[in-house]
Amino acid sequence: MRSSTILIVLGIAILAVNGVATALTRDGIEMGTQEKSRLLRSTSTEHETDEERKFRFKLPSFRFKRRVKVPKVAKPKKKNPVMANRARKYHDVLHSDRGYDVYDMMRSDKLTLQELIEFLTTYGQIDKNGIKILTDGLRSYNIPKAYPVAK
């Protein structure tokens, strides 16, 4: 066989394989996502009548926008820097390794648990975890619920 006939036979074989591959993909056996979406779009509009097209419309978006009223944010009150520093000390001790020293500080300042929690929340130095730490350790440290008022 000559080399030219071999090349012709190989060319015909390549064309045949390519034709079979395209025929299989056209049948939907190995269809890509782009071809699937194109096929879906073309079949979805085939069964639509003129009456159905009349009812298909978009609402204008500018008419249905709601105006949201934003409440005015109150200006934060100026806080006493001395008290803020004291609250920061409570916070640092509470979240350190010696967290139970807070109860000694409470005793020395004669603060109840509720007063301490209110004090720390006003100065933004406590979170839910800190409140849990305080209330769990309260039982072992005998912090009074209220100190007696001197008359």
Swiss-Prot record:
Induction of expression: Expression is up-regulated at the earlier infection stages.
Subcellular location: Secreted; Host nucleus
Keyword Signal belongs to the record: yes
Motif (RxLR-dEER): 38-53
Top-rank taxon: Eukaryota
Signal sequence, renumbered to the chain: 1-19
UniProt GO cellular component terms: extracellular region; host cell nucleus
Record's keyword terms, sorted: Host nucleus, Secreted, Signal, Virulence
Keyword Membrane: no
Main location: secreted
Family according to the record: Belongs to the RxLR effector family.
Function: Effector that acts as a broad suppressor of cell death to interrupt plant immunity. Inhibits cell death induced by cell death-inducing proteins, including the PAMP elicitor INF1 from P.infestans.
Domain notes: The RxLR-dEER motif acts to carry the protein into the host cell cytoplasm through binding to cell surface phosphatidylinositol-3-phosphate.
Annotated protein name in UniProt: Secreted RxLR effector protein 30
Organism: Plasmopara viticola
Gene label: RxLR30
